Amino acid sequence: MTDYAGQFNPGFRLEAARVALVVVDMQYASASRHEGLGRLLKDQGRPEQGAARFDRIDSVLVPTIQRLLAAFRAHRLRIVYLTVGSELPDYSDLPPHMRPMAEAVGNTRGRREHEILDALAPRPGEAVLNKTTMSAFHSSGFERLVRAWGVDQLLFTGVSTNSCVEGTARDAADRGFRCVLVEDGCGAASAALHDAACHNFQRLLGRVDSSARVLAELGAA
């Protein structure tokens, strides 16, 4: 059945001078099957509960984000990395709904778990902003930075599609940014969660598109 919402979301074209690539929370705490959440699940004897998440990260997200980073760097386009985690050893700066997981996986600044995956590591001079909430708009200088760049189009990648990615993208849309969830650049705990977040986002909030299409549209393929 056709969704009536489509008529209210006419879409937009990406422009290289106005766009930034946003890499969300691709850290050892949440994006590695060997550290952080992956290690916790293994130690608990239930690694299969993370299998779908980490299989997609390893086989789809990392290669996709690597291609996007390479293209954006080659064309000197804007890149910003977001991380999530505590700035304090007692995790007291995190809201109650985020603190238990951060504590369980050791996600605090200065620990390996807080670092971005080596395969996606930022280069010198690239922006890395930490947040202590799911949305970067509430606990970092993200909005101030991208507005200073003259950016009003944002390409979102990373984890998890249904939490920090969608949370930041929703807030961006409410602030007038034109947003794209890069479908093959995002992932969640399950395909169902990822697909639901993508479906919901594209109804009224922005676009959901493939990395190949956005790079072609930007002339950066």
Segments predicted by a language model, with ranges:
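Active-site-adjacent betaalpha module
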Residues: 1-20, 34-38, 66-75, 86-90, ...
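Short hydrophobic beta-strand that contains or immediately precedes a catalytic carboxylate
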Residues: 22-24
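Short acidic, Gly/Ser-rich segments with clustered Asp/Glu that frequently serve as metal-coordination loops
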Residues: 26-34
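Surface-exposed cleft-lining segments at the edges of enzyme active sites
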Residues: 30, 51-57, 155
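A solvent-exposed, charged loop/short amphipathic helix patch at secondary-structure junctions
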Residues: 34-54
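Short coil/turn segments at secondary-structure boundaries
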Residues: 52, 56-59, 104-108
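Alpha-helix-centered segments that form part of catalytic cores
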Residues: 55-66, 118
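A basic- and aromatic-enriched beta-loop-alpha substructure that forms the phosphate/nucleotide-
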Residues: 80-85
